[in-house]
Regions:
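Sec-dependent N-terminal signal peptides
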Residues: 4-14
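Long, low-complexity, intrinsically disordered N-terminal extensions of eukaryotic proteins, enriched
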Residues: 14-18, 86
Length: 119
């Protein structure tokens, strides 16, 4: 009986350590180039993602920090968007042990500057 319990415990431990990275929500879902404030905060929500390593490879976009909370289900990314950054799509690459997941993210072109808006 003891062997069965220990085997079950080992299986549970291994299955959670190799759990698939699954992002359920990302806010904001996209952003714009040409904004006055160059820092962008992105919130990721998914089961046990706080220990993921993050990589972003897009010209003009730099990951300045990734912050996890007490809840292992949230991860906040702080990006710096350079003034010359071109609109386009890139992947937010998450990795943990042997698992990898790419989350597509869009930087759209800003059509009207905020100071020129009427209303």
């Amino acid at each position: 009986m003891k062997k069965i319990f220990l085997s079950f415990l080992l299986f549970c431990t291994l299955s959670t350590s190799y759990a698939k990275i699954d992002i359920e929500r990302i806010d904001p879902p996209f952003w714009w180039t040409g904004m006055q404030d160059r820092e962008l905060q992105i919130m990721l929500y998914g089961k046990n993602i706080a220990d993921c390593k993050i990589k972003i490879d897009y010209p003009g976009v730099t990951l300045t920090k990734a912050v996890s909370l007490d809840s292992k289900n949230y991860l906040f990314l702080y990006l710096s968007i350079a003034p010359e950054t071109q609109p386009g799509n890139f992947d937010i690459q998450l990795s943990r042990k042997r698992e990898k997941q790419n989350i597509p993210y869009a930087l759209n072109a800003r059509t009207i500057q905020g100071k020129n808006r009427k209303g």
